[in-house]
Amino acid sequence: MKTNALRDMTNDELLQKLAEIRQALFNLNFQHVTGQLENTAQINKNRKDIARILTILHEREQKTAA
């Protein structure tokens, strides 16, 4: 997911998206372990999306704290 699209979302939307991506990552890891996953690049993509969302949330926390 693009960073600009994430920055346009509210905190509630970001938290909801974060939960969705974490659930998808869990499912992908499960499929990977059982040998059913064909596109392993999806795991890294989801990890990076999680990091992007957390970074944006932390930046917003820092702005409000300052």
Swiss-Prot record:
It comes from the Bacteria. Gene3D superfamilies: 1.10.287.310. GO terms for molecular function: structural constituent of ribosome. Pfam families: Ribosomal_L29. Keywords: Ribonucleoprotein, Ribosomal protein. GO terms for cellular component: cytosolic large ribosomal subunit. One of its GO terms (biological process) is translation. Belongs to the universal ribosomal protein uL29 family. This is Large ribosomal subunit protein uL29. It comes from Syntrophobacter fumaroxidans (strain DSM 10017 / MPOB). The gene is rpmC.
